[in-house]
Each structure stands twice: as C-alpha cells, then as structure tokens.
C-alpha cells in the first residue's frame, strides 16, 4: 500500500490569516502536510521528520521584543525551509540579518522583479519588462528585511522593498515577502510546487484514491471486528465517514439517522434512499420530530433553541445506542480545521473551537472509543473523497445547512406549521436558483420564516398570512459575505411561486444585508 505520509511538509503557524491556505495549497499539490503552532519543541519536529518546513506569515512584528521565533532546530534539521512574509523576516533575523519597520507598507498587488537565479523561481514569470522577469504577487507587510544573513542573495525586489525575496541555495533556505498561497499571486501554486516537489523532493502521493485506501486500512486496523455507531445526518462529513466505514467494516457499522423534523423538504427520505437503498448501509431512521418540537415549544431564544436541539439529539442517539449491545466505537466527522482550532499552544494563543451540536455532549458513561477517519482532511478534500466514493456531485456541492436545521431558520418559537411552510418555500427558491444557474454562483442560499403576518390579496379576497425572507450570499471564507445581486426577474418568479403555491404565505422579501454587520444566518 502507498505510504501517503512518507513525504510531508511541516508548516509552522505564526498566526497569519492565510496559514490554513498554505496547508491547503500543499495538499492540492499532492503532498501531505501538518500545521503546528510556532512554539513546537525540537523533539516534536524530530519525531515528525518533515521533508521540508514552511514558516507562515503573522500579524506580529519581528521588530517587537518577544515576538514569536522559529525553533532554532528548524535551521539545523538539514531540510529545506521556506519563509513567507513574517516567516522570511524571522528567518533573516535568526540567521544574522536585520529587519526594520518599513516607511512604505505594502498591502495589495505588487510586481516583483526577479534577480539572480534560484530554484524557487525556476520557470516562473508573469511578464517580461525590458527582458527583466517579473511576478505579479500579493503583499501584506509593514516590516522588511534590510540586511541579508550571511550566504544569502537577493532574488526579488519591488520599488519599495529592495529585498522582496532571498535565498541561500546551499542550505536550501528561501524567503519571500509576498504570499504565494493566495490566488492573487498568479504563479503562487507553481512557486510552492517548486519548493515542495523540486526542492524538497516530495512525491505527490496525496490523492483521493490513496487517501481512501489509507483510511480504510487504518479503520480496519483500529476497530478490527468490533462494531461502530455513527450519527448520520446526510451532510458531507458524516456521509463520507459512513462510506469509508462501510467499505472497511461492512455490516459492523450501525448508522443512526435522527429525523428531527427540522430538515429540508423530503431530506429524510433522500437520506434513506441514498444510504440504505443505493449504498446498502446498515441504517436506522429514528422519527423524533414530535420529541424535538415538544422540547422546543414556547422557546424563542436562538441560543436556547440550539442547546435544546443538541441535548435532544444526544438523548435520542443515546437511546438508540443502548439497543446495540456490542458497539465499542463511536465514529465522528471531525475534520482537520477542527483539530487545528482545538489544539492548545503553550503560548495560550490558540483558539478553542465551538462545540458541535451533535457531538459535544455525548454522555461520559457511553465510554466508546473514537473513530475519526477525516481528522487529517480539509473540507475541500472531504468533498473530493466523497465524489471518489460515489456520492453525487449535487449532494457534495450542496450549500451549507446549519446543524440545528430549520430550528434557526424559523425565527422565534418553532412549530410544525412554520417548518412545513418554510420547507416548501425554500424548496421553490432552491429549485429556481438551480434552473437559472444561480445556485452555483452563490455560496449559500436559503429561506427564513418570519413570525409576522402581512396583508395580501388573493383573487377577490384579502388574506392575512406569514412572511418569508429569501437570503443569498457570495463569500470565499464565510467570515465576510456580500448579498448576491440576483436578477429581479428571478426574484419575482420565486416570489410569485411561493405566494401562489404555498398556502399560508402572503409576502416574500429579499435580505440585502452583508456580513458584517449582519451574520449569514438570521439566528
């Protein structure tokens, strides 16, 4: 079997907003990598045995006392090192160079003139000006290297940054003041490929097929002939976990699908058809709608609703698990960003991830071992594996759906009547987005039930019914978002269909709030 972890890159995180993007680019090249806090020990690096090391950017300044530094062993490990932005600056300082606060900060696009040959820039240039090769890059820095360490040479300059790139070819140390990991740097992926593949010598074994083979083998080794239980929601993560486990252990996997009455139109039937009929999984559907809605009765506070939904899920899942006396393992859809955010740095700067609604409160007495086949993978990698396992693209690329489901898209108290109206309205909205080609152009689109009534006219009579708000946004990272400028004709068609086809809705409005100041979801 292919050893997909033999060649690997260690990325030391100094706190840049782009650090996870570096890791995703390295994985995209086809090489395994891990992202660790900058304050790792020499022993940890030795045990990981990286083929190469990348130092990330940072919001910190190398000119400040007590700013983070790379472990000294990084430069004595005998492997190539690439410093990006702050990573280049700390490399320069730690090896005897000098950095200073720049008089001219660079934020945004810049053109780097390439000087002196370097393996990092081999066969790279965006344009030639008077026979001088240039790279179009993305800068984001306030400090700059003003004196090179011994044996380094300048390999790139800009008008305001004389040392925009540097290298020591003999030790295979490289620094770039710009960010090759962002798409704004046009040849960024090629630059990282030069480092990871050509300089570090990594083989590109990190592929969907190899990852599946490795995951299945590791599951078999971990659980043997034991039985495993999984809460299958129909979302991408739990679906991919289910198919990996099914491939590894077959009928020893017990999937529990909790139908909480807060799902999209026909979603419960679709999950059963997909995983029970098509893939032949051992799956139990629990109709818990009345239980969830009963607990939610009279509750309007969004956070209280989330907690109730999470608690009831745990109770229902626990009831089902008690029926399975031989289960020894609990499978979860933990992915790599969860692992990164949960990791505690000894500096205390690491973030603690929010608890997931469906795994955060499992009873201690269940005492099951954890199986987490996706814990090394980013979300985009999970999607690629899902496609390779046979999940339909329409499901893999579906817009995000909140864990509490319609519980946070029905504003205020959640009632069955409201959920039923919202399900039908939302299905019409999504159908028309798909028909018009706008579903793929938006990052997330959904309907919201507003618990207010509005006067309308239907035929010769007046009616006094509920209001639906449509929401569609465009975003790259979901940290910020713009409202989608859907065509008026499309919005008009959706509105007419909802009002005419969903009895109980009298008015449809469109949410034109960005994030910030608004959040994407209403609750």
UniProtKB/Swiss-Prot annotation:
Q: Which GO terms describe its molecular function?
A: ATP binding; GMP synthase activity
Q: Which Pfam families match?
A: GATase, GMP_synt_C, NAD_synthase
Q: Which reaction does it catalyse?
A: XMP + L-glutamine + ATP + H2O = GMP + L-glutamate + AMP + diphosphate + 2 H(+)
* Any one GO BP annotation for this protein: GMP biosynthetic process
The Glutamine amidotransferase type-1 domain covers which part of the protein?
8-205
Which sequence ranges form a coiled-coil region, renumbered to this chain?
none
| UniProt domain GMPS ATP-PPase: residue ranges | 206-398
Residues at which ATP binds: 233-239
Give the matching Gene3D superfamilies. Answer: 3.30.300.10, 3.40.50.880, HUPs (3.40.50.620)
Sorted alphabetically, the keyword list is: ATP-binding, Glutamine amidotransferase, GMP biosynthesis, Ligase, Nucleotide-binding, Purine biosynthesis
The Gene Ontology CC terms held by the record are: cytosol
The residues responsible for catalysis, as annotated, are 85 (nucleophile), 179, 181
UniProt cross-references to PROSITE patterns, sorted A to Z: GATASE_TYPE_1, GMPS_ATP_PPASE
Q: Which cysteines are joined by disulfide bonds?
A: none
Database matches in SUPFAM superfamilies: Adenine nucleotide alpha hydrolases-like (SSF52402), Class I glutamine amidotransferase-like (SSF52317), GMP synthetase C-terminal dimerisation domain (SSF54810)
Q: Which pathway is this protein engaged in?
A: Purine metabolism; GMP biosynthesis; GMP from XMP (L-Gln route): step 1/1
> What's its EC?
6.3.5.2
Quote the function comment for this protein.
Answer: Catalyzes the synthesis of GMP from XMP.
The UniProt entry, under PANTHER family, shows: GMP SYNTHASE [GLUTAMINE-HYDROLYZING], GMP SYNTHASE-RELATED
Subunit structure of this entry?
Homodimer.
Under what name is this protein listed?
GMP synthase [glutamine-hydrolyzing]
């Amino acid at each position: 079997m292919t050893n997909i972890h033999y060649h690997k890159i260690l990325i030391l995180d100094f706190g840049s907003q782009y650090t996870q993007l570096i890791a995703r680019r390295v994985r995209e090249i086809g090489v395994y990598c891990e992202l660790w806090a900058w304050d790792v020990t020499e022993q940890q690096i030795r045990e990981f045995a990286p083929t190469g090391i990348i130092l990330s950017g940072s919001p910190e300044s190398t000119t400040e006392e007590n700013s983070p530094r790379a472990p000294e062993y990084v430069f004595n490990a005998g492997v190539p090192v690439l410093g990006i932005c702050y990573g280049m600056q700390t490399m320069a300082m730690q090896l005897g160079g000098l950095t200073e606060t720049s008089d001219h900060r660079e934020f945004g696009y810049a053109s780097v003139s390439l000087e002196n040959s370097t393996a990092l820039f081999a066969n790279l240039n965006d344009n030639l000006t008077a026979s001088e090769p240039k790279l179009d890059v993305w800068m984001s820095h306030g400090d700059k290297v003003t004196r090179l360490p011994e044996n380094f040479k300048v390999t790139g300059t800009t008008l305001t940054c004389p040392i925009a790139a540097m290298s020591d070819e003999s030790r295979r140390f490289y620094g770039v003041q710009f960010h090759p990991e962002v798409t704004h740097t046009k040849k960024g992926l090629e630059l990282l490929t030069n480092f990871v593949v050509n300089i570090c010598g990594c083989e590109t074994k990190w592929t969907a097929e190899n990852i599946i083979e490795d995951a299945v083998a590791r599951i078999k080794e971990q659980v043997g002939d034991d039985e495993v239980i999984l809460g299958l929601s129909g979302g991408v993560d739990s679906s991919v976990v289910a198919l990996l486990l099914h491939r590894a252990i077959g009928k020893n996997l017990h999937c529990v699908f909790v139908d909480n009455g807060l799902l999209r139109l026909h979603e419960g039937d679709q999950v059963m058809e997909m995983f029970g009929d098509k893939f032949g999984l051992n799956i139990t559907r629990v109709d818990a709608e009345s239980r969830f809605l009963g607990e939610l009765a009279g509750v309007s506070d969004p956070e209280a609703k989330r907690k109730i939904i999470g608690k009831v899920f745990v109770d229902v899942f626990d009831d089902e698990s008690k029926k399975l006396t031989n289960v020894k393992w609990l499978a979860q859809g933990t992915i790599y960003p969860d692992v990164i955010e949960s990791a505690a740095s000894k500096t205390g700067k690491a973030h603690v991830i929010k608890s997931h609604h469906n795994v955060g409160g499992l009873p201690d007495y269940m005492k099951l071992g954890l199986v987490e086949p996706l814990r090394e993978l980013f979300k985009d990698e999970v999607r690629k594996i899902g496609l390779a396992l046979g999940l339909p693209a329409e499901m893999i690329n579906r817009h995000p759906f909140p864990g509490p489901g319609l519980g946070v898209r029905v504003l205020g108290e959640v009632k069955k009547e409201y959920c039923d109206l919202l399900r039908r309205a939302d299905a019409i909205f999504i159908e028309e987005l798909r028909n018009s080609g706008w579903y793929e152009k938006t990052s997330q689109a959904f309907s919201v039930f507003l618990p207010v009534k509005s006067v309308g006219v239907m035929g010769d009579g007046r009616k006094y019914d509920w209001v639906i708000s449509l929401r569609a946004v465009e975003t790259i990272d979901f940290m910020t978002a713009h409202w989608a400028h859907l065509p008026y004709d499309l919005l008009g068609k959706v509105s007419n269909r909802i009002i005419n086809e969903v009895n109980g809705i009298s008015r449809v409005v469109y949410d034109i709030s960005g994030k910030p100041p608004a959040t994407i979801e209403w609750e």
